[in-house]
Amino acid sequence: TTTLKITFLPLDPDALMRDLDFDEDARTWAGAIYETIYESDALNKYKDKFEAYKPSYAGDTGYSGPTEPSPGGSGSGSSAESGGSADNTIDISGFTNPRTKNNHDLAAYAIQAWEHGWGYVWGTFGTVLTESMLQYKLEQYPDIGASEAFIREHWLGRRTTDCVGLLKGYGWLNPDTLTIDYNTNGMPDYNADRMYASAKENGTEYSGMDTMPDIVGLGLWKQGHWGVYVGNGYAIEAMGTQYGVVRTKVEGRGWQGWCKIPYIQYDD
């Protein structure tokens, strides 16, 4: 397994302005902005204004359903159904066309993730959670540490994803090797909100939930969260650390919009 590791270094404003070829006036203006923000108490004073936009590393914490963890098994019989026992295989034998990225196979991929009891870890997209990958994610997103014990007990050694990672993992799936190869096949590494916005930017269909057609493989969106519509009123979503990948009824989940994903071919 290859792990992509990205290191973020402290910002050097002078070096950044040199790289961007700022002239003297632009340097003065940018320097004033930088000092105002970073050398004042503004960030601390107004931090509450930004709390709503801070990602929830535990997943869709707005869910009000069952609180028991669902790491595979027969499901709880509630509105959030867990999948089957853990299975790390990816089977594309039932895909309609593995050589394209299409809505029917996206739905089949999502259903398989549910049936195979995939787990949830922020920043993952369907690969098997190894010790090295978990350590990297703990470094990358320290807030995950609050759920480390649960992740180790339930998800280590199993395939994991976050909400929009379920879509990206399908997009990055290599049909020849059955590996999930990061940032391939034209599928961008967007978060949930950015992925939904891309529908408008690329001219694909999107709207509020009252107009949603019954087409499998549609993207479902609400602020900070993503799901895949699989037909008959159901969605598959990587709900959160305590739930993993589950099946839920679309109605009553608070979805704000649907879209045809620009990077998926729709054969209605």
Residue ranges and their predicted role:
Residues 66-73, 77-179, 223-225, 236-238:
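N-terminal capping segments
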Residues 222, 228-252:
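Catalytic Cys-His active-site segments of thiol-dependent hydrolases/isopeptidases
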Residues 24, 44, 101-108, 193:
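Generic alpha-helical secondary structure signal
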Residues 212-219:
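Short, hydrophobic/aromatic-rich segments at coil-to-beta transitions
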Residues 1-97:
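Cell-wall glycan-active module
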Residues 128-153, 179-211, 266:
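Surface-exposed intrinsically disordered loops and tails
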